[in-house]
């Protein structure tokens, strides 16, 4: 497994600086996935929630876009990264999550003596207003966030095909949720149509919860043309078993009864307040 220093080896100094200053050391999925993605391999990242899967998939693409933007005479306004999510809400979250590193990276450019650049992200779903759809066709985003259904519709229109014709990277999120049903089959067909449209190899990156057998998920990700003797031509980053859990069971000091008194609830609320203040993120199931 590469060390954190090795994980940043091929990154631009600006993208490396933002990550180290803001997030510190890359997570294990990021350390394992980045070299494979930078080498151009199809990559499946299987890791639990909160392990940095999003930047594990996206950060190489962001770095590529930045380096292309800074190279004189080679920067073009074209959509090269396609993110597909089975949920519209998840797609909107991804756009907001990408805005933070993109804004931070571009803000660092003057410090490194580099000119300003713009890397745009747009969402295209059934809820996208017609005015925004037309704007995307005239001013293509560098990263397009969409759903399987909207991808299919884009592939059926002249403007949509033109927008997608420059795609070089596809990121499939929650890929395990689309296996084994008609929606997954439909998306698989759309990916093959997209591959034929571009006329060039498209790098496929999948994000999944830990699944077994993980090889079946990888087969779905790469498609039929990217398999050898039944084995997917894909790097599998399976970090699900590497996450450590610290579990603590606590009970109130007052006796527990079938109908808990307000005193007991008061102790629970007080403890929840303490835990919330001590931690950056807290999830409470009631």
Identify the residue ranges that each predicted region occupies.
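Conserved pre-motif I regulatory segment
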Residues: 2-46
């Amino acid at each position: 497994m590469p060390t954190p220093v090795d994980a940043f080896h091929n990154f631009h100094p600006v993208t490396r600086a933002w990550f180290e200053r803001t997030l510190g050391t890359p997570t294990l999925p990021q350390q394992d996935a980045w070299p494979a993605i930078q080498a151009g391999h199809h990559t499946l990242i299987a890791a639990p929630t909160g392990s940095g899967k999003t930047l594990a998939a996206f950060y190489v693409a962001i770095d590529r876009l930045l380096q292309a933007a800074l190279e004189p005479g080679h920067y073009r306004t074209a959509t090269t990264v396609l993110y597909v999510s089975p949920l519209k809400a998840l797609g909107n979250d991804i756009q907001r999550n990408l805005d933070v590193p993109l804004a931070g990276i571009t803000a660092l450019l003057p410090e490194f003596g580099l000119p300003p650049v713009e890397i745009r992200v747009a969402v295209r779903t059934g809820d996208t207003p017609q005015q925004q759809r037309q704007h995307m066709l005239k001013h293509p985003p560098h990263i397009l966030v969409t759903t399987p259904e909207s991808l299919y519709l884009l592939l059926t229109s002249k403007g949509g095909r033109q927008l997608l014709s420059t795609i070089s990277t596809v990121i499939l999120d929650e890929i395990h949720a689309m296996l084994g049903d008609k929606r997954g089959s439909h998306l698989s067909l759309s990916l093959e149509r997209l591959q034929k449209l571009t006329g060039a190899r498209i790098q496929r990156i999948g994000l999944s919860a830990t699944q077994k057998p993980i090889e079946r998920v990888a087969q779905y990700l790469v498609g039929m043309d990217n398999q050898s003797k039944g084995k997917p031509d894909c790097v599998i980053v399976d970090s699900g078993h590497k996450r450590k859990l610290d579990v603590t069971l606590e009970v109130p000091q007052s006796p527990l009864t079938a109908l808990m008194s307000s005193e007991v609830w008061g102790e629970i609320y007080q403890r929840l307040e303490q835990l919330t203040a001590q931690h950056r993120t807290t999830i409470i199931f009631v």
